[in-house]
A protein has these predicted regions:
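Conserved alpha-helical substructure of the radical SAM core
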Residues: 2-120, 124-125
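Disulfide-bonded cysteines in secreted/extracellular proteins and peptides
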Residues: 25, 29-32, 277, 283, ...
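Short, flexible, mixed-charge acidic loops at enzyme active sites
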Residues: 30-34, 134, 213-220
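Conserved AdoMet/S-adenosylmethionine-binding subsite of the radical SAM
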Residues: 57-59, 63, 81-200, 207-209, ...
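Radical SAM enzyme [4Fe-4S]-AdoMet core and its adjacent flexible, acidic
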Residues: 146-154, 161, 165-278, 282, ...
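A cytosolic small-molecule/anion-sensing beta-strand core signal
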Residues: 291
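Flexible mid-to-C-terminal extensions adjoining Fe-S/redox cofactors in radical SAM and related proteins
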Residues: 302-409
Length: 409
């Protein structure tokens, strides 16, 4: 029986990111926030999701959905460390429990393990593949290396070639760090020139501490006066990076290359949901399930203090719509400091991701986003362009018209 203290499950779709191989990965990227999550499961040497766990999750996840479409997201670690047979079982279970719903799958991979066989599987089953790649070789190989310290870029590019060969739909997730942030146009043009139509930028902001179990990355529950990891992008770098790329994109690529943060900005300008939790008023809509059934509030909050429970003991609905997760969701908005509440750009960023809110604002209140200066620079810079594109959309004209206006001015 459903707990009476949970929010209505019909308010929004249930969304859970799966970790079928836990934090296991064939790379050892120097900035990775997830690799050390293995320390949370030191009593288990086999961080692989069992067939039993896979079936329980699949059945419950589909049954909990109130929408006609269901999205399965496979993440890591490196999810391709599981065999194709595992994912064939996953597809069979999805078909078994679909009950008339449309099932879609997306997988995020570093791309180094892709083969013809994998790509044939993705093509035949219409999977979307996200590739983690940090731009040109020099910038990618600076941080994204093997456990032996060897570069990985060439293997990733081979993987992308195989995806193209088999006509698999793919997009890119690129980490912006202290090194590659200094080269925004070269970075952006690399993706555009390689035929990547959908691009997500993820700024690295991590703080270092020491936990008894060996973990070194901090959560918001840790002491706030702790140092940043060396790879972390600075607010100034982040603002300059976004503005420089936007100026190129808005003149050449609107409607052709889709950059997630630009799409989210326009959505918030229009007053519609941006679809990405970081730029939404509230978050907590996307949980994470580890290999053993442990469920956490968010992929960036896989810490003991943000564990919601285990699927063997509690239902997904009880965990993800329960009071602990609802409080986590509301806190994104209710914990904004005074400076944010007074800001004319709050509607566009909503404070961004809570994991980055560890600074004090100009009034001395805790909770300002570390990247605030960069975001404000970006939103102020793009405001007139967003105003124009908003007017075009409201008039039922394509926002890409802005390119013609800029060309003629």
């Amino acid at each position: 029986m459903m707990n009476d203290n949970i929010a209505t499950p019909f308010a929004k779709p249930l969304y859970v990111m799966l970790k079928p191989a836990g934090a296991h990965c064939n790379l050892a990227c120097k900035y990775c926030y997830y690799l050390e999550k293995n320390h949370l499961y030191q009593n288990s040497h086999r961080h692989l999701m069992s067939d039993e766990m896979l079936e329980q999750f699949t059945r419950e996840y589909i049954e909990a959905q109130t929408m006609p479409q269901v999205l399965f997201t496979w993440h890591g670690g490196e999810p391709l460390m599981r065999s194709i047979d595992f994912y064939k079982k996953a597809l069979a279970l999805q078909k078994k429990y679909a009950n008339g719903k449309q099932i879609d799958n997306v997988i995020q991979t570093n791309g180094t393990l892709l083969t013809d066989e994998w790509c044939e599987f993705f093509a035949q089953n219409h999977w979307l593949v996200g590739i983690s790649i940090d731009g040109p070789q020099e910038y990618h190989d600076h941080y994204r290396v093997t456990p032996a310290g060897k570069p990985s870029w060439e293997k990733v590019m081979q993987g992308i070639s195989l995806l193209k060969k088999h006509r698999v739909e793919w997009n890119a997730m690129a980490v912006v760090n202290a090194y590659n942030a200094e080269h925004p146009l070269e970075f952006y043009h690399f993706f555009r020139d390689n035929g990547c139509q959908y691009l997500q930028f993820t700024p690295i902001v991590e703080r270092l501490t020491e936990h008894e179990d060996g973990r070194t990355l901090a959560s918001l529950a840790d002491d706030r006066e702790i140092p940043l990891a060396a790879a972390s992008v600075t607010p100034q770098q982040w603002g300059n990076f976004l503005c420089t790329i936007f100026d190129d994109w808005v003149r050449h690529d609107v409607g052709k290359t889709f950059v997630e943060i630009f799409d989210c900005t326009l959505a918030n300008w229009m007053g519609v949901l941006p679809g990405i939790c970081a730029y939404s008023k509230e978050c907590g809509h996307a949980g994470v399930m580890e290999h053993n059934g442990d469920v956490y509030s968010c992929d960036h909050f896989v810490f003991p203090e943000y564990k919601l429970g285990n699927i063997r003991e509690q239902s997904l609905i009880d965990m993800l719509y329960g009071e602990k997760q609802q409080a986590f969701s509301r806190l994104k908005h209710t914990s904004l400091p005074r400076q944010c509440k007074e800001c004319d750009m709050e509607f566009a960023c909503h404070g961004e991701c809570p994991k980055n809110r560890f600074e004090k604002d100009k009034y001395g209140e805790q909770g300002l986003n570390y990247l605030c200066q960069g975001y404000y620079q970006y939103y102020s810079h793009v405001a007139p362009y967003m105003d124009f594109m908003k007017r075009e959309l409201l008039a039922q004209r394509p926002p890409a018209n802005i390119m013609n206006v800029l060309k003629n001015n």
